[in-house]
């Protein structure tokens, strides 16, 4: 059996569409809203799934076990995203959250697989038949990926188009999708690197933040968070306050957040400079969330932030 190399996923840099003069030098793929995964197929019929952090999440997705038998004895390592699809066929992170974190509960994972099935979207291949492909250009890797015929009940290879980025972005907007990933055709695969060769183009501005505290709610929100206090890591590792967010979550999410914050409660402020907020309570800076916003102030605060989702798949160090 071939010993497969451990690969950290290559990451995209947030940005805008490439200029028209460079449009034809990029392939455009739909940005999926799920859990990044590196897939290990050693060629013996087994499957290994590792998250962006390197954690083994194979038991959480039993319906993907069939992958091990569809490609014969060819050893390979692939890159992709596990998603849960809504009724319109769009990736829905909120649905997927019911499946995440179940690697230690295989019986529950099997039950959830029947009600919230996972789908694995492949978009790259980095090792095949004993040879590393990380130094091969994107075009060669994509050709190798498409040649595998990875179409099944719980996996597929979404389309990629060369050029026509503006039209592709408008199509994703009309379909209610998050945006695009633009990949330079000549780009090599850079494990663990956030590369400018891949550009993440979102239709709304979002940012991952670290929750460092909260302000208790009042009235019917008594005992629940009224607003979360958000931070971002500076280069020296300190936590800088970037604003508070008090909208965007459902009643269920608010209750979930209350429990997480209560478990993370501490007496000391984790921010470099205490926020100018009355009645704040502090939390260990370990919860990561994603918020939407319109722009930033000169001081770096987020304007008009709205809560989008918890990011249990990210650690605080992954937010920069």
Annotated model-derived regions:
Residues 1-320:
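Catalytic cores of nucleic-acid ligases and guanylyltransferases
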């Amino acid at each position: 059996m071939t010993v497969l190399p451990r690969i950290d996923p290559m990451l995209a840099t947030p940005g805008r569409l490439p200029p028209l003069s460079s449009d034809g030098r990029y392939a455009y793929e739909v940005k999926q809203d799920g859990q990044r995964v590196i897939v290990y197929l050693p060629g013996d019929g087994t499957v290994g799934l590792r998250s962006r952090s390197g954690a083994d999440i194979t038991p959480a997705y039993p319906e993907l076990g069939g992958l091990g038998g569809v490609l014969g004895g060819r050893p390979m390592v692939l890159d992709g995203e596990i998603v849960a699809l809504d009724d319109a066929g769009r990736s829905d992170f909120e649905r997927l959250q019911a499946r995440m974190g179940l690697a230690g509960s295989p019986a529950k994972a099997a039950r959830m697989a029947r009600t919230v099935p996972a789908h694995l979207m492949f978009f790259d291949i980095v090792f095949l038949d004993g040879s590393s492909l990380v130094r091969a250009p994107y075009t060669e890797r994509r050709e190798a990926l498409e040649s595998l015929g990875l179409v099944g009940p719980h996996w597929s290879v979404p389309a990629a188009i060369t050029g026509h980025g503006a039209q592709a972005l408008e199509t994703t907007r009309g379909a209610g999708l998050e945006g695009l990933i633009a990949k330079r055709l000549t780009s090599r695969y850079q494990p663990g690197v956030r590369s400018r060769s891949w550009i993440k183009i979102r239709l709304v501005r979002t940012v991952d933040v670290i929750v460092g505290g909260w302000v208790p709610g009042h009235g019917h929100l008594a005992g629940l968070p009224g607003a979360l206090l958000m931070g971002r890591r500076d280069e020296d590792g300190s936590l800088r306050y970037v604003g508070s967010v008090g909208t965007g979550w459902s009643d269920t999410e608010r209750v979930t957040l209350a429990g997480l914050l209560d478990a993370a409660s501490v007496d000391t402020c984790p921010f470099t400079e205490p926020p100018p907020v009355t009645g704040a309570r502090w939390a260990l800076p370990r919860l990561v969330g994603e918020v939407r916003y319109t722009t930033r102030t000169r001081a770096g605060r987020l304007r008009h932030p709205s809560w989008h989702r918890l990011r249990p798949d990210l650690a605080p160090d992954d937010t920069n």
